[in-house]
Amino acid sequence: MNMIQSAKDQVLALTTAAYQKAAAAGLLPEGVTVTPSVEIPKDTANGDYTTTFCLAAAKAMRMNPRQVAQILTEQMDLTDTYFTSVELAGPGFLNFRLGSRWFGDTVACVEAEGADYGRNDTLTGKKYMVEFVSANPTGPMHMGNARGGVLGDTLASVLQKSGADVWREFYVNDAGNQIDKFARSLDARYQQLIRGEDAVEFPEDGYHGDDIRELARLFYQQEGEKYLDCDEKTRHDALAKFGLDHNIPKMKADLARYGIQYDAWFFESTLHESGYVADSVKALTQRGYTYEKDGALWLATSRILAENLKKAGKSDEDIEKLGLKDDVLRRANGFYTYFAADIAYHRNKFAVRGFDKVINVWGADHHGHVARLKGAMDALGLDGEHRLDIVLMQLVKLVRDGEMVRMSKRTGKAISLTDLLDEIPVDACRYFFNAKPETQMEFDLGLAVREDSENPVYYVQYAHARICTLLKNLEAEGYTVPAADAVDFSLLTDETEQALIKQIASYGQVVLLAARDYDPSHINRYLTALAAAFHKFYAACRIKGEEKPVLLARLKLADTTRAVLKNAMTLIGCSAPEKM
């Protein structure tokens, strides 16, 4: 149950009932219909909830809003509600003050729902796919992949918490130009091992990393000179297969170490082998969106996007300024482009597997591809504008002691995900990378391993561990956490106690926001706020040494905080240690 929404609903119900009572008594005009807002004011000194009902209704009633508000307060019955008082404020606001029943029901809700606390059914019945990381399998994963991994995995969890049926997928680009380049790079290093470094020229556009040398060495170690004198295609196919068979399991292992598991690894090559790329291009042709030029087959991307922009209200002049261009789908040599395969892949997501919504997590450098891919789905009649969403994330800068870090101290090479996980705890990596996707972030390697309140993940985990220690100590003294229905919540009158329960109650709203905005960093900010609220409560309110009823009420509040901290930490893929 969302206790904040429950309180808002009750404010509306109380206000509506008071209006109907006043209208029946002839105190207010009948038949007035309004849709007022109910909000939590920034300053809760005068009330916990406020409504604009009187301001919205006064115009239709042709009365002063304060006069309407005064009548409603006199007609309002707060018996057996969450509220203890309602007051007129400002130009006609009604301010409601929460009572102990709401605070008690909030704690009871956490107890009853357990791990499901914070869940909502907004997306129930919807089938979502989140595709993320999808790193090039020709080399190690980098910091962009590290950030995208956390963002995609946590977003998927948030969507699940909002009721969606979520599928996590990694798209393996095991076909096309980059695999050809991968094979040529491995071939050069393989031959250099046998013929000598100077005897074989390395391709100028090849992959120059040491990982290519190592793969070639391993291939030579396994196969010897077996492939040296065979035809180039056979050698390239063998080298590419060997390299991918080595790299992909390593990627899976690193991502599993990072706490990420996929429902499927979808291989691009299967789209080509099954003929689905050709079939998708044919479907675009049948719909009149392709043409031939210079021996190649082109997608009329500019026309598709122009049609969409006109529907959105753009003028021909504005569209002309954009310089829209068309895209090659099939080259003159008969090979399909990466874009053609990408169109086929996304068509498969919608037309074959039936996802209601597809979310891709991409680096911001792919922003130019967003409209093109959405447009291609529109051209296929798959409503890419509304069913395909792209989350673009900005770059990551690694920093140590205020200086940008580009190379691993251990390897002397660009820092990979493996290097990062060797140095930084997984919890810190996941917490730090779960930042707002649209902001460029600095990952402070020094801060990530600090064990003090400056480290945000440590700060939150310490709050959880602190509560666990408290519970253990009190248990040793004979005090166990009571059930909510055995607690007198009217004893929790300190402002820090009530502020903490309000934070606990807001968790469901935060999950809703994170799902709506495709921004799971809402959960991080919530965790920091909840931990801060607990530390304030713990500093202000003694637990040990209090009278038993107060002790048990505060003990229950502490344990409820622990449960919600663990719930939210689990949601973002971090642990909640019981001692630190």
Located regions from the model:
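Non-catalytic interaction-recognition regions
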Residues: 2-104, 111, 115, 119-580
